C-alpha cells in the first residue's frame, strides 16, 4: 500500500511550533480595510496561534497518520 500524501493546501497555510501548537496567519485582512483603524490593520499583520480545538483538527488533516 503506498504512502498517504500530505494535503498541499494545508501545508502552505499552517506551521507547527516545537511544542506542537499550530501557527496560522491572521484572518480578515483581504478587503474592507477602509473602515478599520490603523491600529486594527497593524494588529492583523503577522501570525497567531490557533486554539487547541482547531489545532487538533489541522494536525489530524495535515498529517496523514495523525499524532
From Swiss-Prot:
Tagged with keyword Ion transport: no
Keyword Oxidoreductase carried by entry: no
GO molecular function: structural constituent of ribosome
GO biological process terms on file: translation
InterPro entries (UniProt xref): Ribosomal_bL35, Ribosomal_bL35-like, Ribosomal_bL35_CS, Ribosomal_bL35_sf
Keywords for this protein: Ribonucleoprotein, Ribosomal protein
GO CC, one annotated term: cytosolic large ribosomal subunit
Family, similarity comment: Belongs to the bacterial ribosomal protein bL35 family.
NCBIfam families referenced in this protein's UniProt entry, alphabetically: rpmI_bact (TIGR00001)
Protein's name according to its UniProt entry: Large ribosomal subunit protein bL35
Organism: Rickettsia prowazekii (strain Madrid E)
Lineage, uppermost ranks: Bacteria, Pseudomonadati, Pseudomonadota, Alphaproteobacteria, Rickettsiales
